[in-house]
Amino acid sequence: MFDPSPARLPVTETPQIVVVGCGAIGLPLATAFAARGCDVLGVDTDPARLAALRAGRVGLIDEGLGDALATAVGAGRLAFTDTIAPADRPRAFILVVPTPVDTDGAPLLGNVEAGADAIVAAARDDDLLLVRATVPVGTTRRLAGIAAKQGRRLHLAACPDRSVAGRCFLEQFSVPHIVGGMNADATHAAVQLLARLGPTVAVSSPEVAEAAKLFANVQRDVTFALANQLALASDELALDFGEIVAAASEGYARFALARPGPVSGPCLTKDGALLAHSLSADRFGLARAARALNESLLDHVAQALARHVSALPRPVIAVLGLAFKGDPPTADRRGSFGVALADRLRADLAHATLRLGEPTSGQAAERDLDRAIAGADVAVIANDHPLIKALDPSWLARSLRGGGLIYDACCALAPVAQALPNAVTLRRIGGHFPAAMASKRAR
């Protein structure tokens, strides 16, 4: 492993930590540093978010974060502002802003560039600028060039966040932080900083750190796509995917598959595009095909639902699960399969009534899963929140209209050994999936 030993120590006193971007990733990170006793300033441009944070209110679902934020704000270790002002003390700036892509998959790096400009304008020489955002390979080095052109000598390093939504705060202390600086001094400064939270892995350059995050997410997208492809093949062959998987894996450790289902959210849906932007277009066919396959599940499910309700004059469809994933719970709906499915059904089935259910919703009506299900013709399981996953298929069947359909898009519900009451059909992509393998879906 790369040795980050510096020629000299660039930080000689405890720096103030300035986290630029206090959303779903930046806020848990800022709070984690404050929980370790650091002096932290969070910067964000959203007035409503700032007002809530100054009052110690989280505004998102993340295990352990609420209490830690209230404690840090109350103790004066964590404050918030909308601007970055110059200071007469060393500071470590951490850039944690969204990096979306456009409809063609091209990265939109305006947030990164604006944040970096604001940091460079306020920083002192030898301050640390740590790029925590997920960016195309080479972005940190480009930002170093921008800082140099403005006459600022900063220590730049990359360390993309790798935590899981819903457990981002806790994973700051457990998931290794992959750190790559522009030189040994920058790497050392970043390692010193992040070692306050948890384990670190020093690498030889920011490009290695940037690529490590993107490679991992592309691997997961491809892994899920393979499971989905084989599950769809099982459907076409009229075979039970779960039975095939159980038989093929019995006493045979060389075979393992993820659980099929939607692959959504703000990361896996676009990180492949960020990596592709760093490469020649003709070198990324497998990952592009995997992303297209995963996105095709929306068509597959929507068409199956349309066929089921085609003869009904006023069908009622309940979509359960609007967050992009359910376990660990999150309220984040960016890139959500459930939201996209609801939008698609509204467009394709104008005569249908949609009911939406989401346990993490701020709206009481959406949290009431019983209300969404009662008397519906179809119930779609669109994420694996524990409260949704715990629904008994037989109870669901009795709650639906006779001849109804339960479409478990996530393969989250318990297996059913016999016919369901009320002439209700339970359908999954590829059939059932062995319960013992369900944990392999976590992301």
Language model regions located:
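Structural/interface elements that position substrates and couple domains in central-metabolism enzymes
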Residues: 2-443
